[in-house]
Amino acid sequence: MAENMTTTQIEVGPGATNATINFEAGILECYERLSWQRALDYPGQDRLNRLKRKLESRIKTHNKSEPESKRMSLEERKAIGVKMMKVLLFMNPSAGIEGFEPYCMKNFSNSNCPNYNWTDYPPTPGKCLDDIEEEPENVDDPTEIVLRDMNNKDARQKIKEEVNTQKEGKFRLTIKRDIRNVLSLRVLVNGKFLKHPNGYKTLSTLHRLNVYDQSGRLVAKLVATDDLTVEDEEDGHRILNSLFERFNEGHSKPIRAAETAVGVLSQFGQEHRLSPEEGDN
């Protein structure tokens, strides 16, 4: 492999979108609390109303692209957004502000005041601020398939046969593939299967994908912060098979990490997320 090849890191998935929506929902909560304290002027009230309308619309649209288990209401996102702010600002929610007595503490019976406090918020799901793991997570009984000296058709068939006989849940798929008997690449795929009533299993999410060269160096990395949902089983295999197409096109020179990344990202329409390559000539 060429020495000037650089590691290409790609981040794909709605993680940043979720974080942004949740943070803006936290801002909306702060606006509303300021309004309850009768401390928001007319322009501020107008911004509050516009932000609320924008968030309601954006959440409705975003939830359509999320699996049902991950869809959240505006109120749920407010709770997470407030916790994000507390993490970002190291804010102590029990600390008071000298010289300031909140209006709602003096007039708690007012109908505009909320009947909850900071400590009523549910815990933030998962890790704070969508932490991104650097390596595929360890999973019990990982799936491992080794492919050597197979043509694309046989390799694809073996993948399809093997992955559809595995148990439902998270898996890790390890593939070794020779390219012209010169270069072997190791591909780690972390994803999830769904089990249907008829016993058929389909690939529903792709958590992450790493590609290593024969020396163990990472040459391409796809991180799904909130997982990549694939529409159906055929779509899932199409994504995996595209890797073999990228790795087996008969290039006369070593395959570039950037080319591989573009090939994978194009399956999701996410080419714009490719990080700039430096020194990969």
UniProtKB/Swiss-Prot annotation:
Q: List localization entries.
A: Host cytoplasm; Host nucleus
The keyword RNA-binding is assigned to this record: yes
- RNA-binding and homodimerization: region residues: 1-93
What is this protein identified as? Non-structural protein 1
Q: Name one GO molecular function term.
A: protein serine/threonine kinase inhibitor activity
What is the protein's species of origin? Influenza B virus (strain B/Singapore/222/1979)
Could you tell me which residues belong to the region G1P2-binding? 1-103
Q: Name one Pfam family in it.
A: Flu_B_NS1
Q: Which GO terms describe its cellular component?
A: host cell cytoplasm; host cell nucleus
Q: What does this protein do?
A: Binds and inhibits the conjugation of the ubiquitin-like G1P2/ISG15 protein to its target proteins. Since G1P2/ISG15 is an early antiviral protein, NS1 may inhibit the host antiviral response. Prevents EIF2AK2/PKR activation, either by binding double strand RNA or by interacting directly with EIF2AK2/PKR. Also binds poly(A) and U6 snRNA.
Respond yes or no to whether keyword RNA-binding is given for this record: yes
Main subcellular location of this protein, as a coarse class = host cell
Domain of life of the organism in this record? Answer: Viruses
Q: How is the subunit organization of this protein annotated in UniProt? A: Homodimer. Interacts with and inhibits human G1P2 conjugation by UBE1L.
Keyword list (alphabetical) reads:
Host cytoplasm, Host nucleus, Host-virus interaction, Inhibition of host innate immune response by virus, Inhibition of host interferon signaling pathway by virus, Inhibition of host ISG15 by virus, Inhibition of host PKR by virus, Interferon antiviral system evasion, RNA-binding, Viral immunoevasion
Motif Nuclear localization signal positions after renumbering to this chain:
50-55
One GO process term, biological-process aspect: symbiont-mediated suppression of host ISG15-protein conjugation
Q: Which family does it belong to?
A: Belongs to the influenza B viruses NS1 family.
